A protein has these predicted regions:
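Glycine-rich beta-alpha junction loops
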Residues: 1-2, 28-31, 50, 80-88
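Hydrophobic alpha-helical
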Residues: 1-35, 57
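Sec/Tat-exported extracytoplasmic proteins
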Residues: 6-14, 41, 64-68
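Charged/polar, solvent-exposed surface patches and flexible loops
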Residues: 8, 35, 39, 62, ...
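Short, hydrophobic secondary-structure boundary micro-motifs
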Residues: 19, 45-46, 71-73
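Hydrophobic alpha-helical segments within soluble ligand-binding/sensing domains
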Residues: 28-33, 49-65
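Short beta-strand elements at the ligand-binding edges of bilobed clamshell
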Residues: 39-49
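Hinge/cleft segment of the Venus flytrap/periplasmic-binding protein
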Residues: 56-127
């Protein structure tokens, strides 16, 4: 986690305090990163790119059950990152703090939800 190494070096050099005299950002959804955003040590935090695997599995599930995703094109562009606010970080920790066993992607499946016409994948809506 480069941002935390940079923060440590900045503090060790006596150059100031993260979140007060200098701003750091990170791309990470570790507990440390989420807490650092909530405490103000990180000025910006992005994450959520790992959820692309879940979206791919939804599409493969649908394909396996006879619903081809080619109608949306073979190259899908979906937002991979979400810019977290402190409130989003808190919700993320509450919902997924102990793991992703509570993540339910069934509402995104076209097979399980025949009224779904286009995939509406996005990390922010999971919060």
């Amino acid at each position: 986690l480069m941002a935390f190494g940079a923060m440590d070096a900045f503090v060790a050099a006596g150059a100031g305090q993260p979140g007060r005299t200098v701003w750091f950002s990170s791309v990470n959804t570790s507990l440390q990163a989420l807490q650092s955003l909530r405490s103000g040590q990180l000025a910006a935090l992005a994450g959520g790119h790992f959820i692309a695997g879940a979206w791919a599995l939804v599409m493969l599930y649908d394909y396996h059950h006879g619903r081809d995703f080619a109608s949306e094109g073979l190259e899908l562009e979906r937002p991979m990152f979400t810019l977290f606010t402190p409130a989003m970080a808190r919700r993320y920790q509450q919902r997924f703090g102990q793991g992703f066993d509570r993540l339910d992607v069934r509402p995104y499946s076209k097979v399980l939800n025949p009224t779904v016409q286009r995939y509406q994948f996005g990390f922010a809506q999971l919060l």
